Amino acid sequence: MSAKEVKFGVNARDRMLRGVDILANAVQVTLGPKGRNVVLDKSFGAPRITKDGVAVAKEIELDDKFENMGAQMVREVASKAADAAGDGTTTATVLAAAIVREGAKSVAAGMNPMDLKRGIDLAVEAVVADLQKNSKKVTSNDEIAQVGAISANGDQEIGKFLADAVKKVGNEGVITVEEAKSLETELDVVEGMQFDRGYISPYFVTNADKMRVEMDDAYILINEKKLSSLNELLPLLEAVVQTGKPLVIVAEDVEGEALATLVVNRLRGGLKVAAVKAPGFGDRRKAMLQDIAILTGGQAISEDLGIKLENVTLNMLGRAKKVMIDKENTTIVNGAGKKADIEARVAQIKAQIEETTSDYDREKLQERLAKLAGGVAVIRVGGATEVEVKERKDRVDDAMHATRAAVEEGIVPGGGVALLRASEQLKGLRTENDDQKTGVEIVRKALSWPARQIAINAGEDGSIVVGKVLDNEQYSFGFDAQTGEYSNLVSKGIIDPAKVVRIAVQNASSVAGLLITTEAMVAELPKKATAGPAMPAAPGMGGMDF
């Protein structure tokens, strides 16, 4: 085990505070509509230009171990804000740095760190209650577009794309962001359920121009096992032929004789048929097949349920108005499932999302939920260069999470104003002792920093801007950094999702409280560089003069 260096008290906190300030100073320049870009060096490829606070924070690694510990703790604030709300990372970082800065002064003045932390926690509870009381539900498409535009640093086009996406797939639908191959940004919406499995054989293709299978008013057989022989299925296939309708087979695999027979029948025109592999693996596959069954009003054929293929009848098959299958994806539109059954399945998946502790499982469950409940919207972000596309994609990602958060918990005035108003509510907050009161005061001062920093980035005096906003008692009155005017921010569309602001405050105070109550720090001693042994002379080099 290598030797460690230990620092205590003021010495430890000072080094840690230096690291916090370095990270916060790099991140806070991106805040607000007039925030600047940060250029990140990459070990390969072109440098990355971004205004995304968490992307900047993740790049910072300091040489001094003690400074780096402080920086990494605040980086954690940005990461947690990004994970929980997808936005508000810069605000959370600015708040955390402000609380740590003020808290360190109070500890140095001899106050009890644990009482300070208790005061900070009391203040945060009051701030969260104030945000929830004053948040306004998002109802119109315009409000969603405004939230998206603000989060994308004032880009109205991105806001409009997001509002359209939410309108088309609903609040439960999945919105994914990809890089486009062209200059233009575009929105593509997939209605119905889509899963990432294509046709097993290209001989099933019905539209040769687009190389895809298109079937209208189709039956769907949902089978959990492999199909290698069609003997058990013959009665069912004959019944389907009698109806004159096409059949889509979803199974673990279709191979050998079964595949050959289906292809021959398809080519001869006796049976309109296509086969695709079932999506997912293991238990997830069973669940997804059950989803497809519920969506199409059919039954998943599984030996677990005691159903054998030879006993399957037409009324056990699913139905859909349209099925499209290309090389990579299968889309089922307008399944014949009962609305009540689909809603019950959606409620069941939502309950599983609440209970799961795995991020991966949660993501997969949300994908399943979206496929059942809404659909999938894909925003393809375009740009002139790769660097521009990546920077824009970062902003679209932020904006997408912000719009989701706004729909969940409503909106509050933007520009740091909601936090300024909440800070006024802390003035009369009752505490048990003076040190706790100082903890509340630390949060009260810190809450003005986001508004102050937005003004500074816009070239204004932060203190004057904060003073003018607080002089006006109207809740939504604030400073529009884009135009340099004071006005009602909500009516101008300058709004923040209440969830984003709440999570920024909670995460910032949580990590800052831990930093304030730190009394000792332990880090590895830097390794001393040792000179390696001299390189031996190569044979035949003796007597050479240079």
From Swiss-Prot:
It is an enzyme of class 5 (isomerase). It is found in: Cytoplasm. Keywords: ATP-binding, Chaperone, Cytoplasm, Isomerase, Nucleotide-binding. ATP binds at residues 30-33, 51, 87-91, 415, 496. Induction: By NifA. It catalyses: ATP + H2O + a folded polypeptide = ADP + phosphate + an unfolded polypeptide. InterPro entries: Chaperonin_Cpn60_CS (IPR018370), Cpn60/GroEL (IPR001844), Cpn60/GroEL/TCP-1 (IPR002423), GroEL-like_apical_dom_sf (IPR027409), GROEL-like_equatorial_sf (IPR027413), TCP-1-like_intermed_sf (IPR027410). Pfam families: Cpn60_TCP1. GO terms for cellular component: GroEL-GroES complex. One of its GO terms (biological process) is protein refolding. Its EC number is 5.6.1.7. GO terms for molecular function: ATP binding; ATP-dependent protein folding chaperone; isomerase activity; unfolded protein binding. Transmembrane segments: none annotated. PROSITE patterns: CHAPERONINS_CPN60. SUPFAM superfamilies: GroEL apical domain-like (SSF52029), GroEL equatorial domain-like (SSF48592), GroEL-intermediate domain like (SSF54849). Forms a cylinder of 14 subunits composed of two heptameric rings stacked back-to-back. Interacts with the co-chaperonin GroES. Belongs to the chaperonin (HSP60) family. PANTHER family: 60 KDA HEAT SHOCK PROTEIN, MITOCHONDRIAL. Together with its co-chaperonin GroES, plays an essential role in assisting protein folding. The GroEL-GroES system forms a nano-cage that allows encapsulation of the non-native substrate proteins and provides a physical environment optimized to promote and accelerate protein folding. This is Chaperonin GroEL 3. The gene is groEL3.
